[in-house]
């Protein structure tokens, strides 16, 4: 018999053990690896964006079963980085003497949408500058060629995913502030929110 209030243990008894365990946050202090947040049909999830430079001639490769919109986000992120190399402290020769691969793990799962834009910017800039990503921080937001951070949907589900993964700081578009105000305080306890308008603000918060 089961108690009237269903617990996690009851769910396992009824449905069996989970098919897989969601990977917990594990990328703090690394170069080129950034934690993003995604919305899925079954709720929010964390999403890692990885990028790495290899000797080459400036080729940009995108891997991880990405949809067209997500590929466009990666292209925009890289173009913005190239256009702002001086402010970012990047040697422009790196663009000519290296290829960059931008990868989103779990390649068997299709991924699309614009909300990983600022995550891709952060990953790319981290790889070109060698600056590490701060620990326990995640982000979600669309970016433009002008470097503006646009709002995204599914914020509540993404926030819950961040809490499950042990994230403590979140970067969102200033225009998503109203969405956080609608979430019950107990759901966001222990989280610090940073609301931004530009890519530069994202990088200042996310990179060491």
Residue spans of the language-model regions?
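Peripheral, non-AAA+ core regions of ATP-driven protein-machinery
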Residues: 2-11, 17-35, 42-208
